[in-house]
Swiss-Prot record:
It comes from Pelophylax ridibundus. Belongs to the frog skin active peptide (FSAP) family. Esculentin subfamily. The lineage of its organism: Eukaryota, Metazoa, Chordata, Craniata, Vertebrata. This is Esculentin-2Rb. It holds the Pfam family Antimicrobial_2. Disulfide bonds join C31-C37. One of its GO terms (cellular component) is extracellular region.
């Protein structure tokens, strides 16, 4: 039902984030370390 739909969307979003978020995640980590988010 809805739960499996949400799970599917989350999985797809996770894949997209993993692809797109490589450099963004690095920037985010750096800004968290520098505490300047």
């Amino acid at each position: 039902g809805i739960f499996s739909l949400v799970k599917g969307v989350a999985k797809l979003a996770g894949k997209t984030l993993a692809k797109e978020g490589g450099k963004f995640g690095l920037e985010l980590a750096m800004c968290k370390i520098a505490k300047q988010c």
